Amino acid sequence: MEAEHRSHLRDATRDDEPLLEAMTVEAVYLPDGSDPVSRSLLDDPRLRRYFEGFGTQPDDVGVVATCEGVDVGACWARCFSPDAPGYGWVAADVPELSIAIADPWRGRGLGTLMLRTLLDRLAVRGCRQVSLSVDPASPARRLYERLDFLHLGWEGTSMTMIRQLGTAAR
């Protein structure tokens, strides 16, 4: 994992909202040959809640991967309410995780590094579970399964997965 030696993780802050917005676009799974994601999808309030105002709620937590001085990925979690749920919403006290890496930096172990770090931070904060939403065809699904996320249900065509915290991520 060559990139890990040149990479650095830092805490995500309020100032990272533009990065989290960009990473939200990166996180949208598209099969090979699909048209690029339009940034207009960010007009959807249900998607905007993943990054808008990040760092203003006490349960917001995240890490940013920086390689060669450039922010290349982020992994973050937020809690949502039943009246404004995320796509992988389970309960108001279960944070929902988002993760994305800029395309040129994928496949270098950064996703695993960021995800393990965030899982540890959530456990230290006393969170018992974390959820996420993933397209079943996304390569990220294998990472989640390798780190003990389990299929919980469906939201449209996406899987909701959940992981118990307090257990070591392999």
Where are these regions (language model features)?
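Short glycine/proline-centered loop/turn elements that form peptide/ligand docking sites
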Residues: 111, 115, 137-140, 157-163
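Active-site rim helix/loop that mediates acceptor-substrate recognition in acyltransferases
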Residues: 29-30, 38-62, 67
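Conserved GNAT acetyl-CoA-binding A-motif
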Residues: 122-135
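Conserved acetyl-CoA-binding loop-helix of GNAT-fold acetyltransferases
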Residues: 107-120, 124, 145-146
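Conserved acyl-donor/pantetheine-binding loop and adjacent beta-alpha core of acyl/acetyltransferases
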Residues: 57, 66-98
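Conserved acetyl-CoA-binding loop of GNAT-fold acetyltransferases
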Residues: 145-155
